[in-house]
């Protein structure tokens, strides 16, 4: 079963593609964004704390996310997993490497969905209207999220490229085309593994 990490700016389609691959391969999708939004919706103490960061377009503290991810990775390791929205910083990537080593797990690919900023902004504004997500409804918050992505998440591209695990994917095309590309990539990996 595949073990994948999705990277890319907000609005690149990571969640959509992760969900599609999870359904095809019967693999759990682990989305820190979904986990955090559930906490916010339930108005738990963690959710209220996280909402402040999310509404400002900032990242939720590492220790919160790492603990959540560890719990998810331990549930059914034989089914594989697809990480969506984690890691987002070099510190998180290094912590994930340590965590996977501790759990005796590894990942197959890091899939970086590449999408131009103007497309990201348009996608997120549309999603904000459709889904009522406060972190997607305000252009200034979206621009802040892109700035945070460039500063904190984009360095992961070099980190994973140096490990020979990064696959760049054009996310600025129809969803079906992106999915077909990802499936072909995974099928090629399964044949050589």
Curated annotation (Swiss-Prot):
This enzyme's EC code(s): 2.7.4.3
Q: In which pathway does it act?
A: Purine metabolism; AMP biosynthesis via salvage pathway; AMP from ADP: step 1/1
Q: Does the keyword Cytoplasm apply?
A: yes
| Region annotation NMP: where it falls in the sequence | 31-60
**UniProt cross-references to HAMAP family, sorted A to Z:** Adenylate_kinase_Adk
Assembly, in brief, is: Monomer.
**Could you tell me what this protein is called?**
Adenylate kinase
Q: Which species is listed as the source?
A: Synechococcus sp. (strain JA-2-3B'a(2-13))
Gene giving rise to this polypeptide: adk
